[in-house]
Swiss-Prot record:
FMN binds at residues 77-79, 106, 127-129, 155, 230, 252, 285-289, 308-309. It comes from Arabidopsis thaliana (Mouse-ear cress). Belongs to the FMN-dependent alpha-hydroxy acid dehydrogenase family. The gene is GLO1. This is Glycolate oxidase 1. Keywords: Acetylation, Flavoprotein, FMN, Glycolate pathway, Oxidoreductase, Peroxisome, Photorespiration. Pfam families: FMN_dh (PF01070). The active site is at residue 254.
Length: 367
């Protein structure tokens, strides 16, 4: 049967993958309320389409930190992709490059920055956690720079790992044939099996709980790469991020895997956008499964979106071809949404093209 939308890959991945692996990718924190809400909140935003506009030519191109991409749909960092498919991050990198968009490589990838760079040309960002051993951080950043990565996406919502109960039940550990490639030779490559979630105990020992805004400034002393602060959900933190020198913000709740009962990212987006006053770009990840979702995020002020789970699920189902198809389906749906809303370019997508539950009722138009 032909796959006609992004969500269908979820069920295929669930069939194909070992339970421990599928659950690791699919689950959220605790009650998983935010996990559902990331999707549900999109469904409560409705369109106000404009009609009788010539939409014979639609331009979806945009620039992110000065890099031109084919569409405002990018690949978010997701860990350990070789658990999904033997080609892992290699396949994702090639698919993103073929789609003319940006891939963000996770620190906890099962392929190294050098290996991903070797797949060929492409605009790539590197996701970073700050470790207690700052020397490790410096080495990772240097390697990403040397491998031609163009920006650092600094994850700031993980001073501790969220409680993902399925990982505890499954005693999640990295399968024995795989390793966290960026840490090879740093004595951090292999995770031990633990009676809790193996990842939790591994990370608990490595991630620095003292991480603060001064570390964002420290990072700028060791690299010239632009820094995206990933995990901002409030206007207050958006303003501080700008003061701290961030080149951009990613509104993210870590795929609902950290603190449960935070709002959906699409619900938090507008507050963050308003706080930044256009000084730096704001991006969003979390819950994007349709081209309509992409349009809604842009209408609320996002400069682009990132997708995570759809990438690993399509990777599990069909390898590189699956990831290519997900990016193509979202592109096609987004283009159709633009046409049916009367928008010919991204700059024509406005707040007036949508209505949200927190909008005040509009005065009725007088003839």
């Amino acid at each position: 049967m032909e796959i006609t939308n992004v969500t269908e890959y979820d069920a295929i991945a669930k069939q194909k993958l070992p339970k421990m692996v599928y659950d690791y990718y699919a689950s959220g924190a605790e009650d998983q309320w935010t996990l559902q809400e990331n999707r549900n909140a999109f469904a409560r935003i409705l369109f106000r389409p404009r009609i009788l506009i010539d939409v014979s030519k639609i331009d979806m191109t945009t620039t992110v930190l000065g890099f031109k991409i084919s569409m405002p749909i990018m690949v978010a960092p997701t860990a350990m992709q070789k658990m999904a498919h033997p080609d892992g991050e290699y396949a994702t990198a090639r698919a993103a490059s073929a789609a003319g968009t940006i891939m963000t490589l996770s620190s906890w990838a099962t392929s190294s920055v050098e290996e991903v760079a070797s797949t060929g040309p492409g605009i790539r960002f590197f996701q970073l956690y700050v470790y207690k051993n700052r020397n490790v951080v410096e080495q990772l950043v240097r390697r990403a720079e040397r491998a031609g990565f163009k920006a650092i996406a600094l994850t700031v919502d993980t001073p501790r790992l969220g409680r993902r109960e399925s990982d505890i039940k499954n005693r999640f550990t990295l399968p024995p044939n795989l390793t966290l490639k960026n840490f090879e030779g740093l004595d951090l490559g292999k995770m031990d099996e633990a009676n809790d979630s193996g990842l939790a105990s591994y990370v608990a020992g490595q991630i620095d709980r003292t991480l603060s805004w001064k570390d964002v400034q420290w990072l700028q002393t060791i690299t010239k790469l632009p820094i995206l602060v990933k995990g901002v959900l409030t206007g207050e933190d958006a303003r501080i991020a700008i003061q701290a020198g961030a080149a951009g913000i990613i509104v993210s709740n870590h795929g609902a895997r950290q603190l449960d009962y935070v709002p959906a990212t699409i619900s938090a987006l507008e507050e963050v956008v308003k706080a930044t006053q256009g000084r730096i770009p704001v991006f969003l990840d979390g819950g994007v499964r349709r081209g309509t979702d992409v349009f809604k995020a842009l209408a609320l002020g996002a400069s682009g979106i990132f997708i995570g789970r759809p990438v690993v699920f399509s990777l599990a189902a069909e390898g590189e071809a699956g990831v290519r198809k997900v990016l193509q389906m979202l592109r096609d749906e987004f283009e159709l949404t633009m046409a049916l809303s009367g928008c010919r370019s991204l700059k024509e997508i406005s707040r007036n093209h949508i209505t949200t539950e927190w909008d005040t009722p509009r005065p009725s138009a007088r003839l």
